[in-house]
Each structure stands twice: as C-alpha cells, then as structure tokens.
Amino acid sequence: MIDKERHGDYLGKTIQVVPHITNEIKRNVKYLGEKYHYDFVITEIGGTIGDIESAPFLEAIRQMKWEMGKNAVSIHLTYIPYLKAAGELKTKPTQHSVKELQSQGIQPDILVLRTEKHLDEGIMRKVASFCNVDIDCVVQSEDLPSIYEVPVNMQAQGLDAAILRKLDMPVGETPTLGPWRSFLERRKNATEEVHIGLVGKYDLQDAYKSIRESLYQAGTYPDRADRAADERDPLRPGGSAGYAGARAGGH
C-alpha cells in the first residue's frame, strides 16, 4: 500500500483503514481464489474478538460477507471453559464472544465450541439460542487423543454438511474418509517403535511443531516414532552422555 501511495494510485488521498486497507485485504483474499481457481478459499482471522490488531481484518470480512451473500460463510471458534472445582461448564464467555462479533457486524453462521469435556445437548441448545445460530450448526471440538481425529469427529457431527447448506450447495453422499481412517488405525495399532532424539534451542514445544508432526506422520509408515524432547543448553563438552539413549532404527 505504501508503494501504491507513492506511485500515485490513490491520487493524493490520505490512506485510511477504511476503505484502503480493508480493500487491500479483500483483494488478496479474492486474488488467491482467482489465481489458482480454487473452489473454496479458507481465511482465518486469528486472535480474540475485540483485539485492536484484528479490527481491519474483521471489517474486511464483514464487507466480503455482505458483498458475496450466499457465497461466504463465517465460522466462529470459541471456548467453553470447564471449572474443575465446581464441575461446571460455562457458556458465558462464548455468549460474550459472539455478542462482540455481532457488534462488529458479523453474525456467525456456524459455531465450533472448543471444550475439554463433552457437551450435552442442553448446553448445545443453550448456546444456539443465545447466539442466534441454528442448532445443527453448533458443533463441539472436545479434547481427543490425537489432533488427527478431529476431522472424523467434525464429520460425525455434520460440520461438512452444515457448511454446504450455508453455501446453498447440494449435499451429496457422506465421504468415507477411508485413507484418513486407515492412517489413524495404523497409528493406534503400531507394534514397533523408532526412537529419535530431537535437539532444539527452545523449550516451547510449538516451536518445533512442524518437525514433530512430520515425525508423527512418518511413524505411521509402518512404525510409530517415539520423539524424545531434549533441551539445547545441556549440550556442551562432556554433556552428550545424556543422549546416549537416543537411537534410530533400533541401533
């Protein structure tokens, strides 16, 4: 945008968040689909509703949803906290999150409820009612043993069909997800292990997320990879003895 302004594309006008920045955001989203002829373009707005950093992006999404009508659908991921001391699930944070999103001019079409505990139908209906969302468009994403089980869980709740309905598209036969389910079965039924030592600089596990997931996936063909999380700091002269247990291929 700075280059465009200096080039004179804005004819000397003062650059503003609306419409200049929001138009640029929309242009990039549309360009991705037009350039590669995608059927669907998924755009994620990270952060928390109400953050000042995300305001221009939310406004751009609001405009796109208004301009595209049935060709756009908004899915809001929100959190249902579990109070262990009281043994209670709280829906208020979700209600306030959706209310804040609505104040930005965006009515979510679908809600995905992130939760540690399974949500019963009563909670699902309560959220649907207070958030003005169809009950069949409220799905839960509870903690699972593996993140790779999430797509199967989402399909079982009809998330894919809900998206198609909101886009006014025909709902065909339910995919079997055969290759995906086979992948999960191989992981669960692995009989051998390969131990791999990973030496890194940071303690934060997400810093090496791509490496960990690559090993996870590779370990299903046909064995399971057992990754050892090691710190970099102790790795100094004479400090390699602790890594003697790390091995590959059983050696």
Model-derived features: positions:
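Cofactor-cradling patches in redox/metallo enzymes
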Residues: 251
